Amino acid sequence: ERYDLSMARIQEILTEETVPENYRDYFRKVTEFIIQCGEVLKAKEDGSLEQMTLEEGRTLNHKLYVDVLPENYETSYTNPAYAVKTLGEEYGKLLSYLYAEIRGDIIYAFEGRVLDLVIGNEALIEIYNLFEGETLPAAKEIKDVLYWSASDYCDVTLTYRVQEGVDPKLDFAKKIIMESDLSDLSYLYRFGAYISPEEEKTAAFLNSLPEEEIRKMADTYTDGYIRGFEVMGRDLSKKKTVSVRYPIGFERMVRQAVKNFESAGLSVIFCRSAVGSINRNPAGHSGYASSSPNRQYDYDHRYDSAVYMDKAFRDRKIGVLKTAYEQYKEDAAAYAGPAVIETFGEPGFEPVNKPEAWAFTEKQQNLYLEYRNLSMTVVNEYIPGDETSFTIIAFPVPAIGEQFTKIFKETIRINTLDYELYRDMQQKIIDVLDTAEYVEVIGK
C-alpha cells in the first residue's frame, strides 16, 4: 500500500511546477528513473521480465544505466560535480547522494524488494515537500531527512544484508544460474546488473568450451576449497553452506561448481555485491557482480555514508548487526566461508578526486574504523574464523586483448596442474627460504 501511494505521488511530481524552477529538472529526472524501475517491478510481477529476448534485455539495461555511463556522466545529477554546479554546493552534494541511493532501485525492482523501493520513494517525496515551501529549505533539513531515512531503516537494509550472506533460501541469482538456458545470453539481463559487451563475450566464450574443460575449471575451484579445510585441519562436515562470489559471465562454470558443492553436502549462497551506501565498503565490493558502468561514478560515491556517519549511527548500526546475526545465528553457524572467482586483464583506471564528492572527516574515519573492528568481533562470534576457509581462483577477461583465448586456456592449464606435485615443490622452496635472512628480488 505504501509503495502504491508513493508511486502515485511520484507520478504527480513529474508534471507539477510547485518547486522553484532551478530544482525541477532534478526532481523530474529522478522521478522518471523511479517510474522506469516501477515498470521493471511490474514486468517482474507479471512474468514478462523472464521472457525478455537478448535485444530487449540490452535495450532495457541501457535505458536503466544510461545516466551514469561515461558519455553522459558529466551532465548527470549522480555526478556530484555537476549537481553542485547546477544546484549549489550544499544542495548539490546531498541531492547527488540521494539520486545515487535511489539508483539501487534497479536491483530492488529486479529482486522484487518493494520495501527498499518505498524507502527511497518516501525520502524523495519528503525532500520534494521541503522545496514546495514558501522559502527554500536549509541544507540541514535535507540532511536530516537523509540521516533518519538511513538510521530508521537500518534494521531493514543491514538485516537483509546479513541474511543475504548466510541464508541459502534467498536464491534469486541461483535460480538464474541453475534454471536458465545459458546458451541464450538473454539470461545475463535478468540479474539487473549492468551488462557490458565484456560479460556477453565472457559468457559466449565459456559456452564455446567443451564440457570437459568447464568441469576441469569447476573441479579445480571446488576441490581447492574443500582441500583448504583439510590443510588447515578444520571440520567441513559441521558446515552446510558456501558463498560463491564471482563475476557475471562465468555462469557455465559456476553451475558446475554448484553441482560439485552440493555433491559435497554444501548449499550455495549467492550474495550480490552491496547496493546501498550503508552496506558498501569504500575499499571495494564483495559478492557476485558485473563490470561497473562507470568506475568514476563508483569512486565519487565511495564515501557516501559520510552523509550520516556519526557516533549515534555507528552505535545503532552495531546494535542492528548483533540483532541480525542473532536472528540468523543457525544459518551463520552453518556457513563455511567464501569461494571466490576473480578476474584479471581489466583496463587501468585513473580516478579524479573531486572536492564535491562526499568524504569522511577525520572523526568519521575513526568512527568507521571503530565500526569495522566492532563488526568483526560480532561476525566472529557467530561465524568463528577458525572454523571457516576460503579459496580464490582467477581468470582473464576479454579486455586483456587479442590473446584472450590463448591466455584463458593457459590459465586453465596452470590452474589444473598436479596439486600434489607442485605442493611438494613449493614446500621445498619454502623450506629453503625459511633458512634465508633476506631475499633480493631482481628483474623488470
Model-derived features: where do they sit?
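Active-site bordering "gate/hinge" segments
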Residues: 1-444
